[in-house]
Amino acid sequence: QPKPARRTYIPKKNGKMRPLGIPSFEDKLLQEVIRMILEAIYEGHFENTSHGFRPNRSCHTALNEIQKTFTGVKWFIEGDIKGFFDNINHATLIGILRERINDERFLRLVRKFLNAGYIENWTFHNTYSGTPQGGIISPILANIYLDKFDKYVNEYVRKFKKGKKRMRTKEYRRNEVELSKARIALKNANDDCERENAIARIRQLEKERVNIPPSDPMDNNYARLVYVRYADDWLCGVIGSKEDCKKIKEDFKNFLKEQLQLELSEEKTLI
């Protein structure tokens, strides 16, 4: 039977205190074995959009992913799950684990750690939900829990996609037509004067072209959604309208509430 964790606090950036549960040495060893087993089972099935608490991934790989894939986005949705680590539903988590793990003894052991409780000021407290921050198995359990959300979002991304490429702007298309005419004029020039005029016209149009946006950012027939998650923080980039963003936020909020019993923070989830 795991022992209750020792509750301690560390300061957060906003001045508040973050609770940590420090397990005993024996429990740390057992948790590390559980973590290794869970990693062997789940690591290969996690989505590439997840970067927190994973081998060879970090906040730096998440930032690189944003730099590579968030090009051309018009809107950002910054997601914050209210008290995520404290509100993981134990029954839902065990149900998710049971989908891949057919070993009830192992699942009971995981549940014992979830229900081990903590001691603060010499008083024992039960834990009915959440995973203790500071526990060795907490990060991978959090990823397993939110992998359901990752898979939902990535399917949402595929359905949201609309159009093959953005429509060209009127100015860019006009420039293309004029440039084509100038090149034909150069090809059909009868003397040096006509040739020089055509070359000058081509250079002028090419110079103007540099300052003309080629694609229309307001094209309603083109839409894209990109997503990256690090631990319980996630970010979406949207090529679409603000109404699209509001619908995405509402859909994500409903999925988290109905499927994972989690709540989006209205104050911190921003468009």
Where are these regions (language model features)?
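Non-catalytic terminal/accessory segments
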Residues: 1-271
